[in-house]
């Protein structure tokens, strides 16, 4: 599939069938995710893959409000959950090493991490997996995480932050309808509105 086609076809799917996702497809999606940019080659982003029905239902428990409103619990429906985790300390340790320009004794997060690399790298991994899912003809969505609950449930070490979950599955026939109910569709802002050349324009 051409890259531009994958970008244009990507959608957040909020209703899944019970059809499983081939493990080989999941592995390829994860492999693409790990190939994202990583500051200083820190490689502090890791994934927990959850396929167990009971565990997925537990993870989805915090989304009961959707069910109460008459929507499917799409988090529980998705047969694969990829919990994306990132480690701030791995990045801090990497940037203390001699080959990094910022290896100074008195650095602080406030000085050097105004926009932390561990979040931008994790976001890049998420985006790559969402696009890879399109290429695999797999439906996907990204949802925020309840970090403390996920850490306890999945045994995630204290030094790692669960930043969200990539849901993988196959879209149900009503997927677009439920997506529109949960977030009214809007057209993309035109390129001329979002791009500023040389100086921010009105």
Question: Model segments located where?
Answer:
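Small-aliphatic-rich amphipathic alpha-helix that forms the alpha element of a beta-alpha
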Residues: 29, 33-34, 82, 102-153
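Glycine/small-residue-rich phosphate/adenosyl-binding loop
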Residues: 42-122
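A short N-terminal beta-strand-loop micro-motif at the entrance of redox/enzyme domains
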Residues: 13-28
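Residue-level "edge-of-site" marker
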Residues: 46, 146, 164
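A glycine-rich helix N-cap at a beta->alpha junction
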Residues: 68-81, 156-178
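C-terminal helix-cap and adjacent tail motif
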Residues: 3-13, 88-90, 164-202
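Short secondary-structure capping/turn segments at boundaries of alpha-helices and beta-strands
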Residues: 31-37, 67-71
């Amino acid at each position: 599939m051409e890259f531009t086609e994958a970008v244009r076809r990507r959608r957040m799917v909020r209703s899944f069938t019970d059809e499983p996702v081939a493990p080989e497809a999941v592995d390829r999606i994860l492999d693409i995710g790990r190939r994202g940019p990583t500051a200083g080659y820190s490689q502090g982003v890791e994934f927990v893959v959850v396929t167990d029905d009971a565990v997925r239902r537990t993870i989805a428990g915090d989304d009961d409000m959707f069910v109460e409103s008459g929507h499917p619990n799409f988090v529980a429906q998705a047969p694969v959950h990829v919990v994306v985790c990132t480690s701030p300390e791995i990045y801090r340790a990497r940037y203390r090493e001699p080959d990094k320009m910022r290896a100074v004794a008195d650095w602080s997060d406030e000085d050097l991490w105004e926009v932390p690399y561990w979040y931008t790298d994790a976001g890049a991994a998420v985006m790559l997996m969402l696009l890879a899912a399109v290429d695999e003809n797999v439906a996907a969505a990204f949802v925020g995480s309840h970090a403390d609950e996920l850490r306890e449930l999945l045994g995630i070490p204290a030094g790692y932050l669960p930043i969200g979950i990539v849901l993988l599955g196959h879209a149900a026939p009503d997927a677009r309808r439920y997506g529109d109910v949960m977030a009214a569709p809007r057209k993309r802002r035109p390129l001329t509105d979002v791009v500023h050349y040389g100086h921010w324009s009105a």
